[in-house]
Structure formats: C-alpha cells, structure tokens
C-alpha cells in the first residue's frame, strides 16, 4: 500500500528489549535472528527506507544492565543490519530518560519527544542537535493526547511542532499516531487518544490543521552579505568551493576571493572561470591579513568567512540571516562537517582529534566559532579592528572570538548553517597541520595568558564538540536523578566524543593508525605550544564505583513496578542515593538497585541488585516488601 501511494516506511524491530537481555542471551540472540530474517524477507522492498532496531529501552533496565553495555548491544544490531542491507538506514529511537544512549554507528539520531510547550520543544530540539553531533536529527515520535487535552489543543500543538521541526533543521518528524486505535503489550489501549483519526475512523481537527499547514522559513535580517574566501595555492580546491557558493539559494550576497600570493595560478583560475567573483590579489601576507583585505574590499553589512576547502550548504546564508534579525549576536556560525572519506587515510583524519570545532557555553551561546564558518557584523568586525596579523596560518579565529567575548559581545550557534569542510588528505598532512596549530597556540598563550592553565592548556569555559554523537563512554557521569527517575537524564563526559571511523574504511590498519594519531596529535600540539611532552594521562573512573554483592529477583503478579518496592524500603529507613549514582537507595553501608521486567501479560518481575557487609538483611527486608506488595 505504501508503494502504491509513493510513500516510504521505517520498520521497527520487535524483540524482548523490556527484559534483562544481557543476562538472558537468548532474548538478544532472538533479536539478531528476527532482524536478519526480516531483512532477508523484505529488505529489498522498494518502500522500505530503514529500520529502528529498538525503541525506548526502559531507563531502569538500562541502569540495571549498564548504560555502556546496552549501547554496545544496540550498536551490534545496527552493525548487523548494515552488513545485511547496506542500502537501508538504521537507527535507535531514543527518548529523554536515556539521553545518553546514543549508538555511535547509527545513520541518524532519532528521539521520541512529547512536550506540550512550544518554547520548551524548540529549546530541546536545539539541544538534540548537539547530542546528534554531525548526524541528521529525526523526531521519531511527537504527539498529544486529545482525550486529556482536547481536540483543539491537539491540533494547535501538532501545528507548531511541525513548524518548529522545520525551522530548526530536523531531517523529519513522525506524528504519533494516525489512529486512536493502537495496541501495546498485546492489548488495545483505550485510555489514550493520540490519533489524527478517532476510533470510528473520523478525522479530528488535527488532521485538517496539518493538511492546511504551509511551512515557512523563519524571517531573516535584510541587507547585503559578503562571502569572503581566502586562498593560497588552492587551485585544486577552490573551484568546488565557489561552485557551491554560486548555487546558494540566497540572492542578496556578493563573493570576495583573496589570493594570498599563490604560486600555482589560483588567481588566474578564479578570474577565468568565476568572473562574477571580486578578486583581490596580495603578496604573501598570511591568513589574518588576507581576511582583513577581504573585509576591506567587501560591501556587505555582514561578513561571512569560509575556507577554500569548504563547500557551503545551499541554505547557508538563509539559515544565518535569522540569527542576526534581532541584533542579539555580533557573530554567528554553524557546524563544519567532513564529507565522506575517499581513502583510508582520509577516514583516519576524519576520526582524529584536532579538527576545527565550535565551543559552546550552552545550546545557543558560543565561546568559539571556527573561521571556516564564521559570520560577523561589519560593525563588530571594525570595532575589534579585524583579525590580528600576527596569526598567519591559524589561531586568528580563536583570538578574534575571545576579543569579541571580552568586549561583551555575544556569539551564537546555528546548527542548520553548515559547510562541508574537507580535512587534510593524508595523515602526514594532518600532523603538519597540528604542528601549525601548536605554533598558533603559542602566540595565543602569549596574548591571552589568563585563558590558559599553568600547564599551557586552553581553559575553555564551554564544551569542545568533536562531531560524534554525545553518548555514554568509560568515565561518563550520568545525571540519573533521584532513584534514576529524572525525566531528562543528561550526561557529562570528560571529553565530548569524536566521530567514528567510516564503515567503508573500518579495518585493522585504520584502527591502528587512528590509535597512533590519537597519541601523537595532542603531544605534537603541546610540544609546539609550550615545549611540554606528556606521555601518560590520568584515566577516568568507571561507572561502577562500588562493586555489587549479589542479585536476585522478586515476582510481582499484580504488575506493580520497582517504585512500589522502593517506596516500602524508604518507609524502613532507606534513603535515595546520589543523583549520578547507579544505586537507587542506601542505608548505612548498604545499597540497592531495582529494575522492572515486563512481558505481554499483566505481571512483572523485579530485578534486585544489592551491596553491603551483611546482604542477608537486605534480602530479608526485600522479601518482606514483596509480601506486602
């Protein structure tokens, strides 16, 4: 039916994800078998676009099994799916209570989000873009229950949510659901009405609202924008850059190319093939001088800087304009995304630390924006005196952003305003680049000593984004909330994750070289910055700081979950544990963690893990609790 109507379908893998599938390997093996069997049967169907390998694994079970182990299990399913059907897209439908459970190898980030406030929804979408890293963001579920909120309120919410998803550059959104008739756990659910159709098949007002919805782009600031590209010996690169700029959808902009003393005929190439470009020829002067010369030649109210190895997206300017409309920011920028690698060395460089990255203080306010994707008002640029000429190859953007902040001006981040940025083509070229970055950081250290530690490392107030999805890793600190019941469970990592190796070049050679580069890169930069070479770094602690003593299970025939058992224990003097701890309750030296397993029937099983010098007391108390429940 979907094929007949020109529709694409995302399938969902049905398996026992609501159980401790790591302790019951048969459940996880059955999931692998079901995925393989399903892909063999319908994987080539023209209407199948992709597969969700899981959907909202319960947060208490994730804590019970271990967040990192669950993430790895989800990644195994995705890897299996990709190996059997590489033409399909694979993802995991996550939700805010396990925000940290993002698989590294998914093709896109998917979140089920149910928020009733437009401002809260928009704010959370901005956050999800940062969790997604370089990947597209899909809202895999959004809806509102008309039984509790009313038909008109449902229509209103679905309308603004669809517009918000468009404004904030999601790759798509799935509305839940088409009909009020739906099943869960083998039974029809009769007390929720999320559908666009009621139980008789009649259309609700929400369907009419969506049918008449005309999505529109957010209003942008008027005025001429000047795109400035500086190049030196970039003849092989700049053609693709200028072709991408020429194809941009915005019409009110000009392009200035500054040739910084090229010896390979770059300027002549630009003049011949791109006559619409304003070309400035300089003697070799350095990157900062070239950028300042471009700004002097430009006529626009806003100056947009990018590099000759970048290819701006078609909506680049269109997405930047609204950020300047309210005069909230003096400068804005967006991500610089590496294209798919063409060789194994490009794949290693793409996954290595040290690439130009934005630094964010929160979901919108930036501390640093790389010069390859930096837009600044002419007023702010002239107030700062442009770029500092002493920075000839790198570091100019860091210095410029720091001076903007020191002057009390604000920098904003726009997730949808991205440029494709080719990384260095070889490992040797990449390491030479890192040496250059280290030299630039030495200049920054001399000019901004207060922004560096005593050891010579930059003291960023915000987080440096590495391009990978924000996910649980060794040493992660997860803010579970009291007894693991926080609705939004955020994560704090010692470092934000990098991109993974591209699947096409994921080999032993690539992994070996990536490990070598990960050792060399920070040490080369540190040596060039302050002549300090660190061989070993302190390792982060594991998630489990206290080893458990034992485990057992309790039956709950009436279907009561862990909350009932925890409440009874609290009446016996047990207290909620720390909000970032993997334990629910504590009493003296005792600790307890619980999770709920549910099947298709009405009953449940409570999983209990405990720690303490005399665990029999905990066991006795829990047995008493079981009888009372």
Residue ranges and their predicted role:
Residues 282-298, 360, 372:
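Glycine-rich, basic loop-to-helix element that forms the pyrophosphate-binding segment
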